[in-house]
């Protein structure tokens, strides 16, 4: 039987779409092919193992409780199940370093599952810094719960493949045209709905992580010479506008340096751009706008968000900001072949 996320809708021949999705969602080991050196187990199994090794996992469970209560306010009442989260550790790759910014991980909507890695050195089963690892886990799971709960609409394409025509507040035509286009690489602001949704999800997950850090008096390392100092500020949403610098990875060796560089790129391209958009569009009303964005992403209904934007900035603001010029144009005519 097909497992659907809370706000997934199958359109057209729903039985055929369900059968195609079932093939994606039956075997989660297909997610781990890019990380053959890491050993993956479900998040539930890892939490049990860490607890048996003396790690205090209560920060994660407190974060889960806070997220469940908060997300119910914006229309999400089901969290990403722990058996749909695979966590990598015990790597055979020398110098492997994990956490939120490890490459090729995150929520996978076709498989309805998330792939993450334990924060810190991955050459072990138990985290080197349990406090930071729990905060990183709170952020990753809270973040992926929002992706899991986002509205999605699936149809079967002409080639028999599943096509996602809606994700949250963004759309895609069956021929591949997207509602909003990518930002220029060096942009300081955004007109891309993918960045808006990703930024909103991470802003919320970092806020929850900051609450957990305060609840358990977790402060992170004292010196910026320790990558954990940066990881703590990143996970709890306390990086300044110009942090970390583009060359943040230079002071750190190996994959830890790569991790710091990825953190810097994500901060600039996602979180900073989203904060700039909130300041631009929601001046004096950032938190209210954040809630409207998340509620729309979960429900797939942009009505209240569009009304707020229209009221503050004039009719048609949402489409004017985000819709590409060619999105609604007729597809090119197919020329009949001569016989």
Language-model features, listed with the residues they occupy:
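Post-HExxH zinc-binding segment in Zn-dependent metallohydrolases
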Residues: 165-247
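Short, charged/polar micro-motifs that form catalytic or ligand-binding hotspots
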Residues: 127-139, 187-195, 264
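Auxiliary, metal-adjacent structural segments of Zn-dependent hydrolase domains
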Residues: 27-121, 130-134, 152-155, 162
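Active-site recognition of the HExxH zinc-binding catalytic motif
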Residues: 135-160, 202, 206
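N-terminal low-structure segments adjacent to metalloprotease catalytic domains
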Residues: 1-30, 323-339
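Short linear interaction motifs
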Residues: 113, 119-130, 176-187
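Pan-zinc metallopeptidase signature
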Residues: 225-339
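Residue-level detector of alpha-helical secondary structure
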Residues: 18-25, 29, 44-51, 278, ...
């Amino acid at each position: 039987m097909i497992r659907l996320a809370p706000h997934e809708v199958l359109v057209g021949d729903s039985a055929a779409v369900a059968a195609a999705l079932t093939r994606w969602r039956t075997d989660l080991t297909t997610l781990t092919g890019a990380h053959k050196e890491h050993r993956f187990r479900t998040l539930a199994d890892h939490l049990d193992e860490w607890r048996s090794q003396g790690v205090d996992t209560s920060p994660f469970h407190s974060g889960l409780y806070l997220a469940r209560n908060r997300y119910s306010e914006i229309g999400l009442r089901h969290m990403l199940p722990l058996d749909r989260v695979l966590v990598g550790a015990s790597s055979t790759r020398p110098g492997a370093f994990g956490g939120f910014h490890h490459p090729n991980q995150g929520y996978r909507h076709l498989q309805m599952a998330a792939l993450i890695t334990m924060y810190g050195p991955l050459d072990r089963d138990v985290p080197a810094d349990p406090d930071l690892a729990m905060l990183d886990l709170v952020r990753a799971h809270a973040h992926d719960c929002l992706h899991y709960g986002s509205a999605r609409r699936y149809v079967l394409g002409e080639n028999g493949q599943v096509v996602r025509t809606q994700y949250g507040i963004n759309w895609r035509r069956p021929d591949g045209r997207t509602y909003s286009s990518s930002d220029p690489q060096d942009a300081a602001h955004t007109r891309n709905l993918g960045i808006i949704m990703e930024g909103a999800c991470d802003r919320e997950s970092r806020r929850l992580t900051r609450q957990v850090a305060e609840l358990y008096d977790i402060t992170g390392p004292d010196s910026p010479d320790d990558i954990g100092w940066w990881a703590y500020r990143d996970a709890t949403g306390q990086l300044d506008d110009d942090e970390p610098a583009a060359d943040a990875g230079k002071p750190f060796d190996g994959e830890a340096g790569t991790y710091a560089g990825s953190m810097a790129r994500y901060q600039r391209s996602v979180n900073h751009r989203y904060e700039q958009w909130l300041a631009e569009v929601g001046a004096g009303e950032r938190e209210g706008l954040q809630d409207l964005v998340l509620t729309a992403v979960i429900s797939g209904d942009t009505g209240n968000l569009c009304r707020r934007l229209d009221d503050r900035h004039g009719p048609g603001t949402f489409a004017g900001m985000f819709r590409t010029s060619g999105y609604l144009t007729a597809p090119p005519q197919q020329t009949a072949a001569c016989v």
